[in-house]
UniProtKB/Swiss-Prot annotation:
Changing D15R: Small gas vesicles. Disruption phenotype: No gas vesicles are made, gvpA1 is still transcribed. Disulfide bonds: none annotated. It comes from Halobacterium salinarum (strain ATCC 700922 / JCM 11081 / NRC-1) (Halobacterium halobium). Signal peptide: none annotated. Belongs to the gas vesicle GvpF/GvpL family. Keywords: Cytoplasm, Gas vesicle, Plasmid. Might be involved in preventing aggregation of GvpA1. Proteins GvpF to GvpM might be involved in nucleating gas vesicle formation. A minor component of the gas vesicle, also found in soluble extracts. Gas vesicles are hollow, gas filled proteinaceous nanostructures found in several microbial planktonic microorganisms. They allow positioning of halobacteria at the optimal depth for growth in the poorly aerated, shallow brine pools of their habitat. Expression of a 9.5 kb p-vac DNA fragment containing 2 divergently transcribed regions (gvpD-gvpE-gvpF-gvpG-gvpH-gvpI-gvpJ-gvpK-gvpL-gvpM and gvpA-gvpC-gvpN-gvpO) allows H.volcanii to produce gas vesicles. A minimal gas vesicle can be made in H.volcanii by gvpA1-gvpO1 plus gvpF1-gvpG1-gvpJ1-gvpK1-gvpL1-gvpM1; lack of enough GvpJ1 prevents formation. The same region restores gas vesicle production in H.halobium without the p-vac locus. It holds the Pfam family GvpL_GvpF. Changing E72 to A/R: No gas vesicles. This is Gas vesicle protein F1.
Length: 213
């Protein structure tokens, strides 16, 4: 069995096993502990996994399963490709980043990320600025923070990520229902819950990924 570990995210210390397919076809997802932290991992035969659509989807699916496995679990997500030479190497990384990880867990405790895209016909037949202002106002009081994402097509009117408290999730869902009813001629894409990808900033050195000196 390979010793390499692919890492999806960090949670509060917990023994966790998930029956979900991981990156590179991994059949088991489990945790590696360091003090009060647990890394969600699976076995992999490389420390430099190729970024494919299939594996990016698997990475995201695992993180969503971690969130679903127990209501109100907080996850610090890792970006795709974080693989380590051994459990010992991973624990060393957790030791070095422990303060930052603990701070981030505290900052995002009890929250999830929700994505909202609104698409129109891509012309001037809809009042884009009015829609942007109205929807932003409706969702602002139900979220802790928000980020503007790229409007990568002329059809996009809104592309935002919202940081939402677990306790306001139902109210946020209802607000999206109201937006869909008000703008039934537009396409509303509502995704999540996700770990707060757009609201964390954790960096782990490449030399640590490969095992260091």
């Amino acid at each position: 069995m390979t010793e390499n570990l692919y890492t999806y995210g960090i949670i509060e210390q917990e023994d966790l096993e998930l029956d979900v397919e991981g990156v590179a076809g991994a059949e088991q997802v489990y945790t590696v502990d360091y003090k009060t932290l647990s890394a969600v991992v699976s076995d992999i035969d490389t420390t430099d996994p190729e970024r494919t659509d299939e594996d990016v989807e698997a990475h995201n699916n695992v993180l969503q399963e971690v969130l679903k496995h127990e209501e109100e679990r907080t996850v610090v997500p890792m970006s795709f490709g974080m693989a380590f030479k051994s459990a010992r190497t991973l624990k060393g990384v957790l030791r070095g980043a422990r303060r930052a990880l603990r701070s981030t867990l505290n900052d995002i405790e009890g929250t999830v990320e929700l994505g909202v895209k609104i698409l129109g016909p891509g012309d001037d037949t809809v009042p884009r600025e009015e829609i942007q202002e109205n929807v932003t106002d409706q969702l602002a009081d139900l979220s802790i923070n928000e980020t503007e994402n790229d409007l990568f097509t002329d059809r996009l009117i809104i592309n935002k990520s919202y940081l939402v408290d677990f306790e306001k999730r139902d109210a946020f869902d209802s607000a999206i229902d109201d937006v869909e009813a008000e703008y039934d001629e537009l396409t509303i894409q509502y995704t999540g819950p996700w770990p707060p990808y757009n609201f964390v900033d954790i960096h782990i050195g490449a030399e640590q990924q490969q095992g260091g000196r």
